[in-house]
A protein has these predicted regions:
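Active-site substrate-binding loop specific to GH73 endo-beta-N-acetylglucosaminidase modules
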Residues: 1-150, 156-197
Length: 197
């Protein structure tokens, strides 16, 4: 349940998606939903600012965020955002692990609606990682982002890279990340290059 498992638990990622004094399940949930799970979120119709002073100081961030996002027009996106963000409450604002908030134990379990509409139980950062590893959308998004990072172009720009095949190979563990990295780098460097014999 606790500990570092995957990119989403790196202290830099966690700290950069926190408030100065508190963790932020909303910012962390948006990051994980978009960048780890590859899910699409639309911008909110009405942006509501979080102000810690508006809530009981004895409440956990989970209680505060649940109260803030309770309206139906918020929950259309916050079902996903909150479910993924609450799994990372085992990390404080700087990314250190924690099991309690003061004297209260943290609840890291959530109900998550996956990309196919199936209800899943996520149990902390490990549960989130397991869901990401099972998701074909996650592997596709990872490959797209890696290609943009390495080649500075979308993967569709390279005719010899079969995006779906790479995604299936990555998901089924037939392709290691380092080999994917090399494949993309080589393709980007040699695309449309004619070798003389």
């Amino acid at each position: 349940k606790m500990g570092r498992v995957g990119l989403h638990t790196h202290p830099y990622i966690l700290a950069s998606h926190s408030y100065a004094e508190e963790s932020s399940p909303i910012h962390r949930g948006v990051f994980v939903s978009r960048k780890i799970l590859g899910r699409t979120l639309r911008p909110p119709k009405e942006a509501v600012s979080f102000r810690n002073a508006d809530y009981n100081p004895n409440w956990t961030m989970r209680q505060k965020v649940t109260a803030l996002t309770k309206p139906a027009n918020c929950m259309s996106c916050h079902d996903l955002i909150n479910a993924t963000g609450f799994t990372l409450e085992g990390f404080d604002t700087t990314g250190r692990t924690r099991t309690n908030l003061g004297t209260k134990p943290l609840n890291l379990s959530t109900e998550y609606l996956d990309e196919n509409g199936n209800q899943k139980k996520l149990d902390g950062a490990q549960g989130l990682l397991q869901e990401a590893l099972k998701s074909t959308r996650s592997s596709k998004y990872f490959i797209e982002e890696l290609c943009k990072h390495l080649a500075k172009h979308p993967i569709q720009s390279y005719s010899n890279l079969n995006f779906l095949e790479l995604s299936k190979m990555l998901s089924s563990k037939k392709l290691a990340i380092k080999d994917l990295y090399l494949k993309i780098a080589m393709q980007a460097a040699t695309d449309d290059f004619v070798f003389d014999n």
